Amino acid sequence: MTNFRLNVLAYSVMLGLTASVAYAEPTNQPTNQPTNQPTNQPTNQPTNQPTNQPTNQNSNASEQLEQINVSGSTENTDTKAPPKIAETVKTAKTLEREQADNIKDIVTYETGVTVVEAGRLAQSGFAIRGVDENRVAINIDGLRQAETLSTQGFKELFEGYGNFNNTRNGAEIETLKEVNITKGADSIKNGSGSLGGSVIYKTKDARDYLINKDYYVSYKKGYATENNQSFNTLTLAGRYKKFDVLVVTTSRNGHELENYGYKNYNDKIQGKKREKADPYKIEQDSTLLKLSFNPTENHRFTFGADLYEHRSRGQDLSYTLKYQKTDPNLAEVDSRHTNDKTKRRNISFSYENFSQTPFWDTLKITYSDQRIKTRARTDEYCDAGVRHCEGTDNPTGLKVTDGKITRRDGSELQFEKKNNTAHSNGETYDFKKFIDTDKKVIEDKLTLKNPNDTWYDCSIFNCENNAKIKVFEGNYSYGYDGKWKEVDLEIKTLNGKKFAKIKDPTNKIKSILPSSPGYLERLWQERDLDTNTQQLNLDLTKDFKTWHIEHNLQYGGSYNTAMKRMVNRAGNDASDVQWWATPTLGYNFYDQPYTCATAYSWNANLCPRVDPEFSYLLPIKTTGKSVYLFDNLVITDYLSFDLGYRYDNIHYQPKYKRGITPKLPDDIVKGLFIPLPKNSNSKPDEVKKNVQQNIDYIAKQNKKYKAHSYSFVSTIDPTSFLRLQLKYSKGFRTPTSDEMYFTFKHPDFTILPNADLKPEIAKTKEIAFTLHNDDWGFISTSLFKTNYKNFIDLIFKGEKDFPLVSGGSSLPFSLYQNINRDNASLKGIEINSKVFLGKMAKFMDGFNLSYKYTYQKGRMNGNIPMNAIQPRTMVYGLGYDHPNHKFGFDFYTTHVASKNPEDTYDIYAKDKKQTDTSIKWRSKSYTILDLIGYVQPIKNLTIRAGVYNLTNRKYITWDSARSIRSFGTSNVIEQSTGLGINRFYAPGRNYKMSVQFEF
């Protein structure tokens, strides 16, 4: 086992807990009976008893309902019970106590589990046991959630430029009844994707609230200073005769997470050196609705709607392609605006049967229709205001007054007179030097346009009654010296609107207008990743005995279809149009109006453009079929086994309809599978034909995978205070379509496809020793090892010369490809303990101590580090609860060790010809303190508050540090100096507070 070090305090806590438990007085009831609940049961099981009886049922039913509710309101079913091996359960009560507002808060005080950071797109799933994102399964009410485009090549090419919302969607905390976190291979529960572990969300139900009452009302309001987030949650539950209903609606409004020193950094600095977090306005809305009908106590029908939307709008001021002004007084050109969205909608119907038959005690059939859209939209335009944007710059202040062009105060235009240049027909002026109303001369800020290029909008200018306009007449056809001249206007009606132009076409006549275009050009891109899933589940349970062995059998199956597709849109248009902007395209020599197709110059205002939809991947339909069987066998009071088996059949089908499916860019598929004919690069028809042939070829490449998963857990209780648990399980993840087919060709970064990828396999072996006592608590130590086989990873394959399209010399291209690595291995140790101090002394009644510790180390292909492994982490806890729950607090101390350079790996080191393959920017060790408390002054009111990072420690987490990219335009810093890294630091001291009314 890899060596590890615990500090003195950790040893003290461990020894104290061990001694306390070992010498605790035995209770009257035996404590060594294994739980009848399996440790890795499937996620969508129905309850074992009907809990929908109205309140006028007999007292036994009421007691039964209350018992079920209590078991669901504490962590790990009972906080004094020993934990199940490699499993943590967070209930709604626990999440409320910890003031969790997002998925990151769920695992704040869990060791060995962190959240993947994704820059402006917040979080993207979890990291467990050395793997992250798609290798950690996430589901809500039995439904798999959206996966990222997981190929590392796609991430580096596109995610690093902020063009895709390539993240895993989250969940609204206020709708959750329970979060089950499992560490290690876990495909019995979730099928494909459960390599490092799983996170399973279960939403609330009306039955959770309607205990001995027919209604429940709750209103909660909270605020957090770390991101100025305020939230409101309204929960309504009611029962009427055979119907019950639950509604939970939550809205959240805040802004970006305030990094350490947020208020002290210069807000004007832009680009990768920016130290202050980029500004975003973040909103989240969620509604959970469940309506149930109970014709009898043994039958229950439920309609559910789970609606979730997360929106983030702001500016990427750290964007590296941002135009950098050399003079702060210059007008702004543009900046990058973001408008990202994650939207999930799940409509479900379920039927539950509680009639005991020879085949089941409970039966549940569920149909779900889930639609998830993750969108990243970027708009590049200037929003600095009319007087400060280059496109609408008007420093002279010209405006239209009573249909004529005037100065900013409505007076006539004035220019600097030329000395000794008076003519009989008027004064000569230098039209390059404009005199403002304050007598200051503004030079070279106006444009003199040819008559044929100038149109006046008659809705703004005076075009009636033989109207005239004052213009510039030059001494020559060039230069700025000239005199005023009043000329006639010619009226034209184009597309139903009246416009005027100067009648005299001489090249000495010029119109006088501001030099800017008079509008703000906007370049926009909108990228959608859609995952639509329809799923049918059948889940059954049956308790029975064979000889003297008790069985808790769970079995069933599922059938699902999922369509995953990418849609990209892009275009140009204009906004903030000013009076001097060209109002019409005009007409040609034959007196025919120009159109956007025939005009000789492009105008973003008059000819907004929307490009045809395109995609980098073909839509993929996935059909999944699975059956599972799980049995919890209780042999004796001292021995039990959990046996699980699952079979999955997964079928990938590319779906392409010519002319309907968004087109793939030619360069992505050109010559991919079917080579281009020789000397065809210069023949567009040949290239187009080859592109279509390759698309058709990909669309016919169906892939089928079959997988067998299993799990074995043994629970042995040799004494009343000692428990030994052994676990061996297998998980898998099938390659995604983008991992197999994605390709990209560029001299700096060329991705080669690999259609021969095998499924990833994970096998976990774990042993846990637990000392426990019903009154004292528990201490559990586990050793684990996970072996990954066929681990998919992106590697640098070297350089290859490709001939240029134009012929002649060749150019070296850096080649990358996804491959199955021979193996990857991870091992580690975890400690989880909680001791209740009331047995030591009466005055300590209600106090508890807790300690968690995780250390893990892993390598791929022998000696390549796994970057997703978290540094050594420990969490100390001191808690108190009043006997009547009038008030309480929790004090947490979290210590995280430094990320050692030898435990990191830069995949671009070889490409950059570096001998040091470690990642340059890593997290240092840190210790943070959190204090959380609650008080219940009256029965219906609960006030919660917390102080986080109590000592105002400056630190960066490893997940934030590893999100820094070595190239790209987003999430980058100046690599040579480290300027910009403060943007990634965690918040300093911050506070949370919430108030909840319940009736």
Swiss-Prot record:
Superkingdom of the source species: Bacteria
Subcellular compartments: Cell outer membrane
GO MF terms held by the record: siderophore uptake transmembrane transporter activity
GO cellular-component term (any): cell outer membrane
Signal peptide residues on this chain, from the entry's feature table: 1-24
Compositionally biased tracts (Low complexity): 26-58
Effect the entry attributes to changing residue 151 to S: In strain: E1a
Residue intervals of the TBDR beta-barrel domain: 212-999
Keywords: Cell outer membrane, Membrane, Receptor, Repeat, Signal, TonB box, Transmembrane, Transmembrane beta strand, Transport
Domain TBDR plug residues, every copy: 77-204
Disordered as annotated region, ranges: 25-60
Nuclease found in the keyword field: no
Topology within the bilayer: Multi-pass membrane protein
Ranges where the record places region 8 X 4 AA tandem repeats of P-T-N-Q: 26-57
Record annotation: effect of changing residue 755 to T: In strain: E1a
Gene3D superfamilies to which the protein is assigned, alphabetical: TonB-dependent receptor, beta-barrel domain, TonB-dependent receptor, plug domain
Locus of motif TonB C-terminal box: 982-999
Sequence repeats: 26-29, 30-33, 34-37, 38-41, 42-45, 46-49, 50-53, 54-57
Recorded consequence of changing residue 304 to A: In strain: E1a
Family: Belongs to the TonB-dependent receptor family. Hemoglobin/haptoglobin binding protein subfamily.
Task performed by this protein: Acts as a receptor for hemoglobin or the hemoglobin/haptoglobin complex of the human host and is required for heme uptake.
Other notes: This protein is subject to phase-variable expression associated with alteration in the length of the CCAA repeat region. This mechanism is called slipped-strand mispairing. Addition or loss of CCAA repeat units would change the reading frame and result in introduction of stop codons downstream of the repeat region. This may be a mechanism of regulation and a way to avoid the immunological response of the host.
Protein name in UniProt: Hemoglobin and hemoglobin-haptoglobin-binding protein B
